[in-house]
């Protein structure tokens, strides 16, 4: 946890990117695990918009599993990474991204920003976030 958040006793934020939590089994399992943690060490943010250019770059370069997780979630990742940071794709509703083939509706994407963790699997949430002391 960052020094500033520690002083303020604020939990870190974990984002779950999903186009439709109701129809995505992996996203449902991820959310269930995250919400089931009673330690209050983190807040859960449900993101239904495509990551911003900055977020995408952070996940890709700062998180060890970033490139693999992003490739599973964003089928056209190589093309998207070439877009200008002002491209309307960044911040676009994920449902539109699914329709355009830019977002895999069967995957989940979660990000623990502070600990530089990113993944697609619910089991990794348990392994890297819930069990982490």
Swiss-Prot record:
Main location class: mitochondrion
Q: What is its EC number?
A: 1.-.-.-
**Which of the seven top EC classes does this enzyme belong to?**
oxidoreductase
Q: Where is the transit peptide?
A: 1-21
Keywords recorded for this protein, A-Z: Mitochondrion, Oxidoreductase, Transit peptide
A GO molecular function assigned to this protein is: oxidoreductase activity
Subcellular location per the Swiss-Prot or TrEMBL entry? Mitochondrion
Which terms in the GO cellular component ontology are assigned?
mitochondrion
Residues at the catalytic site: 97
For this protein, the record's Pfam families field holds: DUF1687 (PF07955)
Example GO biological process = negative regulation of transport
**Its function?**
Putative mitochondrial redox protein which could be involved in the reduction of small toxic molecules.
Q: Which family does it belong to?
A: Belongs to the FMP46 family.
Q: Share any extra remarks.
A: Present with 1240 molecules/cell in log phase SD medium.
Q: What is this protein called?
A: Putative redox protein FMP46, mitochondrial
Source organism of this protein record: Saccharomyces cerevisiae (strain ATCC 204508 / S288c) (Baker's yeast)
**Underlying gene:** FMP46
